[in-house]
Amino acid sequence: APMIVRKRDGGFGYDATDLAAIRRRVGKLKADRIIYVTDVRQSHHFEVLFQVARMAGFLPDDVEAEHVGYGMVLGPDGRPFKTREGGTVSLSDLLDEAETHAAPNIALAAIKYADLSNGLQKDYVFDAERMVQTTGDTGPYLQYAHARVSQILRKAAAEANPNVDPEADLDAMDWGRISVLDEPAEQQLALLLSRFGEIVEVVATDLTPHKLCTYLYELAGAYSVFYEQCPVLRSTGEVRGSRLALCAATRRVLGRGLDL
């Protein structure tokens, strides 16, 4: 399909604006990677835009230009989500709906996780009640896992030093190192923890945040198995120290993953 840079009446449309934006981002802002995040239905427009920009010399071969398309949010009937009046549903509307089922922080996490875990180009049904559940593949489930690990570490810190500040930064404490991995649950958890950097690199390169969500869900599940099969606070000696280090690493990775 052709790209109309200038209209017959002399005016300029979106195509010209997009080309000018690329020229400025590369020439003035020195961008080496440009990412557009819009409705997946605009994929063809950006395919043509990038081709024309390269032909015009605005987009050199050593500058990456990518379009990340996202799907639609659907209502319970499987159709595009609309207000009762038939208008477009805003993010604040979705947050208000989620907050009828959970506290604001949990509701926000639930929506963000549900949106990112689905795979950007896929449509998904907005179900606030399901999104705020603390079981299954949801944001609140990961928040709960992070809170549970934190509780264990705070108990361990209090046992070691009764005068420790209950609000102390757990990440700033020295939890030793992971040195004993005799149990299968310990081994599986440690293996997943070792893959965090690899997963983040893949997500950043391929622009696939759902892969990070899948990883964090698997990590939370592996920690749950570890928690059930490998007592932490009831263990002693080197085993206890190693398991506390595993807990600290799990908390750190879950926290950083959720921040991302």
Language-model-detected regions and their locations in the chain:
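Non-catalytic interaction-recognition regions
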Residues: 1-260
